[in-house]
Curated annotation (Swiss-Prot):
This is 2-isopropylmalate synthase. It is an enzyme of class 2 (transferase). PROSITE patterns: AIPM_HOMOCIT_SYNTH_1, AIPM_HOMOCIT_SYNTH_2, PYR_CT. The gene is leuA. It comes from Anoxybacillus flavithermus (strain DSM 21510 / WK1). Pfam families: HCS_D2, HMGL-like, LeuA_dimer.
Length: 514
C-alpha cells in the first residue's frame, strides 16, 4: 500500500484566512498538536515575510522533533537565506520555494519571459541545495499553465536538485479529471520524475479541493498539502482530515494510507477552531458536530439495529468521545495536573498553579467540569502571554423588557489607570460594546460576533469570538466565561489588545529594517 505524506500548511496558508492572526504561543500550540496528529511536514510560515514569522518558524523548528518543519520562500536568495537561519536547527530542515508559471502570472505579476522564469527557478533550487537536504519546488498557478512549458520547467528544477515537485491549484480552478491528467502528463513527459515526489496543493474556490487531492493520489501523487478544517485564503484549502479519513475508509479503492493518528483529528480540529476563531460548520464532514447525528426516523432505526447501515465512520475513529465529567470541586491539584497532561498540554508549575485557581473558581459555580471546560481554561489563560494594553476589571449591565439596556465597564490601561464608562444600546451586547468603545476612546468597528457553548447544560461556559477593525486593520479575539456578556467583553478587549500587539510588532520590524 502506498504511503502518502501529509504536508500541513495550517500555520502558513491557513493563517492567511481573513481576520486570523495567531501569536507565537498559539502557533507553537498548534504545531505541537500537529506533531501529535502525525503529519509528516509542517509548513510553519514565511520566514522572510516578517520578524514575527521568522521567530515563529524558528521556534517551531526548534520545538518539533517527530516531523519535518519547512518554510516558504520566493525564488530570491535573501528569502532562502532567511529560511535557512530559521530552520537550520530543525530535526529535518527543508525548503519550499516557488515561482509562478502561468502565462497570466508571468506577464502581469512577474513581468518575466518564460525563459527568465525557468532560469530563476533553476538558480533558486541550486542555491537552496547548498543549505537544505530537501528542497520542494512549487509552480504557482500550475493548473493554468501551458503543460509543455510546465513539463520543461519541472524537468529543469529536478536536474537542479529539487526533491519534491508541487503542482498547486492556486485559484481552485481545476476539476478532478483535469488535475489528475496534469500529473499523468508530467509522469509521461518529464525525465527523472520517478526520482522525486509529486505533491498536490488544492484550493477550494469551486468546492473541489478534497476531490482534486484524491484525484492527484490516483494519478501518482505521494504528498498532499492542506489545512486543518480546510481553512485558508478565500474559500480555503483541502481539509487534511477529510483526505486522511477518505483514504482510510476507502483504502480498498485508493490503496494508499497516511501515518496520521486519526484519533487526534477531533482534538486538532477543535484547537485550530478555538485559536483562529473560525467555527467549524455543524455539517462539516468528519469534524462537524452533526457529522455523526441522525435526525431521520428511518436512519435512527437503522443505526440502532446496526450502525453500519448509515454510519460509515465511527465517531471514535476520529477521536469524538462523550463529554463525560472528569473533575469536580473536590478534585486536587495532582488530579488536575494529570488530566491536563492526558489532554496533551505541557504546563509549567506556575501555569498549573494559576490555572488551578481558575479551575476551583469555575468548579464552585459549575457542577460538572468537562475536558472542553479545561481546554477552554487553558487556551484562555496560557496562550495570551503578551503584554495587555487594556485589562477588563468589571462589567455591570442592566436590562429589562421595558427598559433601555445600560452597561457600565471598568478597565485598567497599560499604566494601571482605571477607566470607567457607561453607555446604552438597543440590546445588552450593544450597550456593553458602546461602553467599551467610549472607555477605549477608539473608533473600533465590530465586524463579526459569534457565540458557542463549551459543553452542554444550563451551566455551560460561553465562548465568544469577535472580529474588529480599527484604521483599516483587523484582529480577532475570543473570550470565555459562564456569563455571555462577560465572555463578550473579554473577546472585545482581547481583539483590541491583539491589534495593538500586531501594530507594535510592525513598528519594531520597520525600525529594525532602517
Amino acid at each position: 500500500m502506498r504511503k502518502i505524506n501529509i504536508f500541513d500548511t495550517t500555520l502558513r496558508d491557513g493563517e492567511q484566512s481573513a481576520g486570523v492572526n495567531l501569536n507565537l504561543h498559539e502557533k507553537l500550540e498548534i504545531a505541537r498538536q500537529l506533531e501529535r496528529l502525525g503529519v509528516d511536514i509542517i509548513e510553519a510560515g514565511f520566514p522572510a515575510a516578517s520578524k514575527g514569522d521568522f521567530q515563529a518558524v524558528q521556534a517551531i523548528a526548534q520545538t518539533v522533533r517527530n516531523c519535518s518543519v519547512t518554510g516558504l520562500s520566493r525564488s530570491v536568495q535573501s528569502d532562502i537565506d532567511a529560511a535557512w537561519e530559521a530552520l537550520k536547527d530543525g530535526a529535518e530542515p527543508r525548503l519550499h520555494v516557488f515561482i509562478a508559471t502561468s502565462p497570466i502570472h508571468m506577464q502581469y505579476k512577474l513581468r518575466m519571459t518564460p525563459e527568465q522564469v525557468v532560469e530563476t527557478a533553476v538558480e533558486s533550487v541550486r542555491y537552496a541545495k547548498k543549505y537544505f537536504p530537501i528542497v520542494q519546488w512549487s509552480a504557482e498557478d500550475a493548473c493554468r499553465s501551458d503543460l509543455p512549458f510546465l513539463a520543461t520547467i519541472v524537468e529543469k528544477v529536478i536536474e537542479a536538485g529539487a526533491n519534491v515537485i508541487n503542482i498547486p491549484d492556486t485559484v481552485g480552478y481545476i476539476t478532478p479529471k483535469q488535475y489528475g491528467d496534469i500529473f499523468s502528463f508530467l509522469k509521461k513527459n518529464v525525465r527523472n520524475i520517478e526520482k522525486i515526489s509529486l505533491s498536490a496543493h488544492c484550493h477550494d474556490d469551486l468546492g473541489m479541493a478534497v476531490a482534486n487531492s484524491l484525484a492527484a493520489i490516483e494519478a501518482g501523487a505521494t504528498q498532499i498539502e492542506g489545512t486543518i478544517n480546510g481553512i485558508g485564503e478565500r474559500a480555503g484549502n483541502a481539509a487534511i482530515e477529510e483526505v486522511a479519513v477518505a483514504l482510510y475508509i476507502r483504502k480498498d479503492y485508493y490503496q494508499a494510507e497516511t501515518r496520521l493518528n486519526l484519533q487526534e483529528i477531533k482534538r486538532t480540529s477543535s484547537l485550530v477552531s478555538k485559536l483562529t476563531g473560525m467555527i467549524v460548520p455543524a455539517n462539516k464532514a468528519i469534524v462537524g458536530k452533526n457529522a455523526f447525528a441522525h435526525e431521520s426516523g428511518i436512519h435512527q432505526d437503522g443505526v440502532l439495529k446496526e450502525k453500519t447501515t448509515y454510519e460509515i465512520i465511527s465517531p471514535q475513529l476520529v477521536g469524538v468521545q462523550s463529554n463525560s465529567m472528569v473533575l469536580g470541586k473536590h478534585s486536587g491539584r495532582h488530579a488536575f495536573r494529570t488530566r491536563i497532561q492526558e489532554l496533551g498540554y505541557s504546563l509549567t508549575e506556575e501555569e498549573v498553579n494559576r490555572l488551578f485557581v481558575r479551575f476551583k473558581d469555575l468548579a464552585d459555580k459549575k457542577k460538572d467540569i468537562t475536558d472542553d471546560d479545561l481546554i477552554a481554561l487553558i487556551l484562555d489563560e496560557k496562550l495570551d502571554t503578551y503584554k495587555n494594553f487594556y485589562q477588563l476589571c468589571s462589567i455591570q449591565v442592566q436590562y429589562g423588557t421595558n427598559q433601555i439596556p445600560t452597561a457600565v465597564v471598568v478597565l485598567k490601561d497599560g499604566e494601571g489607570n482605571d477607566i470607567q464608562e457607561a453607555a446604552t444600546g438597543a440590546g445588552s451586547v450593544e450597550a456593553l460594546y458602546n461602553a467599551l468603545e467610549k472607555a477605549l476612546q477608539l473608533p473600533v468597528t465590530l465586524l463579526d460576533y459569534r457565540i458557542e457553548s463549551v459543553g452542554s447544560g444550563r451551566d455551560a461556559l460561553a465562548q465568544v469570538y469577535v472580529k474588529v477593525s480599527l484604521d483599516r486593520k483587523e484582529a480577532s479575539g475570543r473570550g470565555t466565561a459562564q456569563d455571555v456578556l462577560e465572555a463578550s467583553a473579554k473577546a472585545y478587549i482581547h481583539a483590541v489588545n491583539r491589534m495593538f500587539v500586531i501594530e507594535k510588532m510592525k513598528e519594531e520590524q520597520a525600525l529594525a529594517a532602517q
